[in-house]
Regions:
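Extracytoplasmic copper-binding redox domains, predominantly the cupredoxin/blue-copper superfamily
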Residues: 2-119
Length: 119
């Protein structure tokens, strides 16, 4: 009987992890309630996103390596920067002005993305 219970527990945990992973992999939907960028495989996905003024974008780190979301360029930062995000860590920012916002990962400056904010 203990073996059945153990197998059931493993199965239940597997279903839970699969469900959480599926939710976390949801990416941005223009005009949707949640605009999300996944950080995985040392890249931002989607790499470019268009939202309306007032939209909040959330970045979620799917990698097991720490990443940041740092606005501006590595050489010319703008001051908006997430803390180092661990696995499944997230950072959200609400865009209040139209424009094009570029961002990168400080530890991995080749990782870049942009958010276009339309009025």
């Amino acid at each position: 009987m203990e073996r059945k219970e153990a197998l059931f527990a493993v199965f239940a945990v597997g279903l839970f992890v699969a469900g959480v992973t599926a939710l976390a992999y949801r990416t941005a939907t223009p005009g949707g309630a949640l605009d999300q960028v996944a950080i995985r495989h040392y890249a931002f996905s989607p790499g470019s996103l268009t939202v309306q003024v007032g939209a909040t974008v959330r970045w979620v780190n799917m990698d097991f390596v720490g990443h940041t979301v740092s606005f501006g360029t590595h050489e010319d930062p703008t001051g908006v920067e997430s803390p180092l995000l661990g696995h499944m860590g997230s950072f959200a920012y609400t865009f209040t002005e139209p424009g094009t916002y570029t961002y990168h990962c400080d530890p991995h400056p080749y990782m870049t993305g942009s958010v276009v904010v339309a009025s």
